């Protein structure tokens, strides 16, 4: 079983369920992804000079295949990806269903591979509408906003994440809090479409105030909140591991993923798989109180169309965006139920 973390996390995020998965009889590996934690060998030059070809979606899948081979294995029974790790996991399952025998996507649903311009030779153009400039549309709202993925792609984001006025520990504690079930305003619902007026219904940690940084956004959201609530599932000592690692590495390595994910030119490699479906058994596990479920409108509803062997969704009550940390026992059961049903 291969466990793939998201942003801003580490392999350490799987600490609560790894031993129990191993006790169930599996060889379990969690790894730091390219740009995170203890990884090295990736381009850590300045923002302007970074070789972003290292961070394309297909290269992240390649990293994963290379790792498994290096460990002496020729297949993975199940790849489990959380948040941006679910992007890696879904791509691995999409591209190499022979190698990744099943996939669990957590907290970030697979939206499908999209369509290429079709039948253009005969003037019957389908699937080639220009993409919505969502940043421009969000900025034009009565309350101007911006999408966090595009903010995370900017030249200033890494420094702002690294040196928040409230201090890194308080910032990360607040970020965990507002995206968890402990923030009582997390009552997500499906959005109708990928358009500014709909996306703006999401909280500020996803669709940010236009002129605020992420640390400023979190500080304002935390003004009346009790940050101690999250300590029941994220101790000071555990949070200290993240603080230590991010202080050591900085954030640009992790943020480079957003730079490729938000740049159509950097997504050209994925166009090779346009129209392809995930062909191995697949399931989606997520916190019931997680807005991440709906940040790609329609993705959850379309799972039976984007995955040929979709086995259903599991929403875990009492968990927001960090289910394997907020409700590890329930996540463990959901993963084992899926894997053992194959």
Model-derived segments and their meaning:
Residues 308-342:
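Catalytic active-site module of serine/aspartate enzymes centered on a nucleophile-bearing elbow/loop
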Residues 17, 92, 334-338:
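Hydrophobic residues on the short alpha-helix immediately C-terminal to a glycine-rich phosphate/catalytic loop
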Residues 20, 66-70, 338-341:
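A generic secondary-structure signal
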Residues 36, 42-80, 87-311:
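Flexible "cap/lid" subdomain of the alpha/beta-hydrolase fold that forms the substrate-access gate
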Residues 8, 33-37, 110, 290, ...:
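Alpha/beta-hydrolase active-site loop signature
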Residues 30, 286, 315:
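Conserved residues in the N-terminal Rossmann fold of short-chain dehydrogenase/reductase
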Residues 1-44, 53, 82-84, 95:
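Conserved HGGG/HGGXW glycine-rich cap/lid loop of the alpha/beta-hydrolase fold
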